[in-house]
Curated annotation (Swiss-Prot):
Cellular compartment(s): Cytoplasm
Protein name in UniProt: Elongation factor P
Functional summary from the UniProt entry: Involved in peptide bond synthesis. Stimulates efficient translation and peptide-bond synthesis on native or reconstituted 70S ribosomes in vitro. Probably functions indirectly by altering the affinity of the ribosome for aminoacyl-tRNA, thus increasing their reactivity as acceptors for peptidyl transferase.
UniProt KW keywords: Cytoplasm, Elongation factor, Protein biosynthesis
GO molecular function, one term: translation elongation factor activity
Protein family: Belongs to the elongation factor P family.
Primary residence: cytoplasm
Amino acid sequence: MKVIASSLRKGNVVEKDGRLYVILSAENIHPGKGTPVTQLDMRRITDGVKVSERYRTTEQVERAFVEDREHTFLYKDGEGSHFMNPESYEQVAVPDDVIGDQAAYLQEGMAVMLSLHNGVPLAIELPQRVTLEIVETEPVTKGQTASSSYKPAVLSNGVRTLVPPHITTGTRVVIMTADGSYVERAKD
């Protein structure tokens, strides 16, 4: 679908020279003299190369149709991580490079949003928070309740994070998937 360059926003996917690019930033520049331009910083989806392009604001750009669908995580194997569409029961294998560091937070039965272009997965969005168990941490030290210091801990998925001093091994905690930071003790 052709759109004018000034209408493109961060997160849109465009097609250029037969390749797909995701827009990292889009800025409309209006110089005092001359025609206004749209500056796009993009990342090529196939290999992650960052590209910067300038278009006249009225220039037509091919915007790729990307479909966001909810999928359920099933399992991981040599092909990648496998997800199922809960409506059609169709399964999709997503390569590890699409998931990236977020793979550590995938749990069986977890609902995620997959961005698909012609049935090919481009990106994945995990829930903001996940509940995990602490498998290793330092013992509780009495008298540290007044300070706001944090201690290192290892989660059940192998990720290291910092937790408050009162958290012990075996405690279930809520973690942010974006940065792996501690949110709160799980309420279950």
